[in-house]
């Protein structure tokens, strides 16, 4: 898979933004990607050094619209920690 296919989008929440000073960034990733592929994709796309990757599968939730009930899609979340000597990801710096 290409790095652009692995990293789908950044997760912008209050909790993920509070982890940025610790050099931890949160992304939605392809469900088939493993930690090694995620690490290589982040390093290639953003030009940084990754120290550690945590992944978690987010289960679908039940949602209702009127009388119709459905489910959201299941997706995979990755939290990436950069090394101390690595530069920060510029996209997230503009959000702080």
UniProtKB/Swiss-Prot annotation:
GO terms for cellular component: ribonucleoprotein complex; ribosome. GO terms for molecular function: rRNA binding; structural constituent of ribosome. The keyword NAD does not apply. Coiled coil: none annotated. It comes from the Bacteria. Keywords: Ribonucleoprotein, Ribosomal protein, RNA-binding, rRNA-binding. InterPro entries: Nucleotide-bd_a/b_plait_sf, Ribosomal_uL23-like, Ribosomal_uL23/eL15/eS24_sf, Ribosomal_uL23_CS. SUPFAM superfamilies: Ribosomal proteins S24e, L23 and L15e. GO terms for biological process: translation. One of the early assembly proteins it binds 23S rRNA. One of the proteins that surrounds the polypeptide exit tunnel on the outside of the ribosome. Forms the main docking site for trigger factor binding to the ribosome. Part of the 50S ribosomal subunit. Contacts protein L29, and trigger factor when it is bound to the ribosome. Belongs to the universal ribosomal protein uL23 family. NCBIfam families: PRK05738.2-4. This is Large ribosomal subunit protein uL23. It comes from Caldicellulosiruptor saccharolyticus (strain ATCC 43494 / DSM 8903 / Tp8T 6331). The lineage of its organism: Bacteria, Bacillati, Bacillota, Bacillota incertae sedis, Caldicellulosiruptorales.
